[in-house]
């Protein structure tokens, strides 16, 4: 056990030294702030979802409207060096309202199998950590070319969504879910390297950079929830059919 602990500690120190050699101190400091704000926003999201599920506070449609207003506000209310805490509060409010909108889905999933939520949460967390580390340890700027490609895929998916509102194709719906997971995974890699490049070019907007990553994480989590729920529903339907035979 001692040898294993020493090995893990040595590998961790090697990793930290590698980051120290690869990134300037101000970049490492900026990334630390971004990830701390991202974690706090995720906590606000969890709080909003829990309050909605427990019927302590349910903003309903107001939460959806608030998320739109807040994200537009963050986009147009640019960082000027003096409004950090105002924008940070807006980000936390956005996270909280996002949790409120997520609450009904989580409540439905709990009625089917609560373990789905933990599975989706674990999958999202492990994927985010793995891809973030991959982006940070990869060659600098290696994945920035993905930006244009990902925007094209997102636009195509949006058109397919409009198409599917009319034709109600189950195949299109499922394809969008699975493709969406891979697209969000690619966005995590792209946004991580893009944040580093922006920081080096003088853009130290912690709130906006945390928002970019939060979008990626939340979108992936939603899709994993739906995919796992659909699989569980199929299993339960098959079990019911087998019992009736």
Swiss-Prot record:
Inactivation phenotype: RNAi-mediated knockdown induces autophagy in larvae under basal and fasting conditions with larvae showing an increased number of autophagosomes. Decreased larval survival following treatment with tunicamycin. Impaired pupal salivary gland degradation with pupae undergoing autophagy prematurely by six hours after puparium formation. Increased adult survival during nutrient starvation.
| Transmembrane parts of this sequence | 31-51, 56-76, 89-109, 116-136, 143-163, 170-190
Write out the coiled-coil annotation as residue ranges: none
A GO biological process of this protein is: endoplasmic reticulum calcium ion homeostasis
Q: Name one GO molecular function term.
A: endoribonuclease inhibitor activity
Q: Please give the InterPro entries that the UniProt record associates with this protein.
A: Bax_inhbtr1_CS, Bax_inhibitor_1-related
Q: Where in the cell is it found?
A: Endoplasmic reticulum membrane
Membrane topology summary: Multi-pass membrane protein
> Cellular component terms, GO, for this chain's entry?
endoplasmic reticulum membrane; membrane; organelle membrane
Alphabetically ordered keywords of this record: Apoptosis, Autophagy, Endoplasmic reticulum, Membrane, Transmembrane, Transmembrane helix, Unfolded protein response
- Judging by the UniProt lineage, the source's domain of life is Eukaryota
Q: Which PANTHER family match?
A: BAX INHIBITOR 1, BAX INHIBITOR-RELATED
Q: What functional role does this protein have?
A: Suppressor of apoptosis. Modulates unfolded protein response signaling. Negatively regulates autophagy and autophagosome formation, especially during periods of nutrient deprivation, and reduces cell survival during starvation.
Q: What is this protein called?
A: Bax inhibitor 1
């Amino acid at each position: 056990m001692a040898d294993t602990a020493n090995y893990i500690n040595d590998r961790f120190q090697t990793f930290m030294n590698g980051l120290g050699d690869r990134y300037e101190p101000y970049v490492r400091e900026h990334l630390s702030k971004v990830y701390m704000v991202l974690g706090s926003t995720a906590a606000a999201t969890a709080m909003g979802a829990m309050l909605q599920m427990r019927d302590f506070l349910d903003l309903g449609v107001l939460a959806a409207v608030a998320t739109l207003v807040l994200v537009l506000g963050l986009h147009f209310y640019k960082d000027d060096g003096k409004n950090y805490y105002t924008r940070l509060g807006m980000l936390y409010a956005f996270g909280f309202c996002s949790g409120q909108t997520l609450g009904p889905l989580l409540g439905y999933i709990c009625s089917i199998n609560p373990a789905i939520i933990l599975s989706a949460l674990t999958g999202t967390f492990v994927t985010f950590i793995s891809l973030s580390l991959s982006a940070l340890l990869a060659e600098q700027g290696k994945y920035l070319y993905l930006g244009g490609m990902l925007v094209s895929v997102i636009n195509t998916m949006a058109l397919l969504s409009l198409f599917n509102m009319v034709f109600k194709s189950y195949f299109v719906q499922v394809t969008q879910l699975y493709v969406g997971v891979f697209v969000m995974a690619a966005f995590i890699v792209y946004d991580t390297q893009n944040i580093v490049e922006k920081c080096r070019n003088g853009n130290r907007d912690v709130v906006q950079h945390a928002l970019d990553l939060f979008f990626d994480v939340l979108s992936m989590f939603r899709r994993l929830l739906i995919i796992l729920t659909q699989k569980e529903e199929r299993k339960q339907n098959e079990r019911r059919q087998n019992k009736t035979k």
